[in-house]
């Protein structure tokens, strides 16, 4: 079954609108409802992506591999931070720089047809999301992030990005093109 992916502008407006709404409402009961709306919307946008990969000849393996790897990375990184209790706040600068590098590479990918760029961007997002998970988990256990709504959405977005990036990598590596 082919599920149409929503218009990119609808996705961007929906995500950023719900994200900023959740940040604004984070200290009220409405923030919880906004969190459910944001995560539900992100799940809605994930449906057509999964449909595309499941339509590939080995799509089930690609999706299950990306899911398993995402779970292993998240549990492994979180366990590392929880057991070592290391303060990962020093990663803030790397996260900022990584964001701008990935933004620039993504924009370049829209305009230039460079072989392997999509794979490199996806690998960069895997690294970026992993560093964000380390940083956010450390912030949560060291009291830097005390708001459960912000902790939830920051980790959820990192896990979502990690999963989608791994899907892209496994999809590229398993295609015959």
Language model: regions and residue ranges:
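A hydrophobic alpha-helical transmembrane-helix feature that marks the membrane cores
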Residues: 1-177
């Amino acid at each position: 079954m082919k599920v149409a992916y929503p218009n990119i502008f609808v996705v961007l407006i929906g995500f950023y609108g719900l994200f900023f709404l959740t940040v604004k409402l984070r200290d009220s009961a409405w923030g919880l409802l906004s969190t459910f709306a944001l995560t539900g919307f992100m799940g809605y946008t994930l449906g057509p992506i999964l449909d595309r990969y499941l339509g590939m000849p080995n799509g089930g393996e690609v999706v299950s591999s990306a899911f398993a790897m995402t779970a292993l990375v998240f549990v492994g990184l979180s366990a590392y931070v929880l057991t070592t209790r290391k303060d990962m706040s020093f990663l803030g600068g790397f996260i900022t720089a990584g964001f701008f590098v990935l933004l620039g590479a993504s924009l370049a990918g829209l305009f230039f047809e460079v072989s392997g760029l999509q794979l490199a961007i996806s690998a960069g997002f895997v690294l970026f999301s992993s560093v964000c998970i380390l940083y956010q988990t450390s912030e949560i256990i060291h009291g830097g992030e005390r708001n459960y709504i912000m902790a939830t959405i920051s980790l959820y977005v990192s896990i979502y990005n990690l999963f989608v990036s791994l899907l892209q990598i496994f999809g590229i590596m398993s295609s015959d093109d």
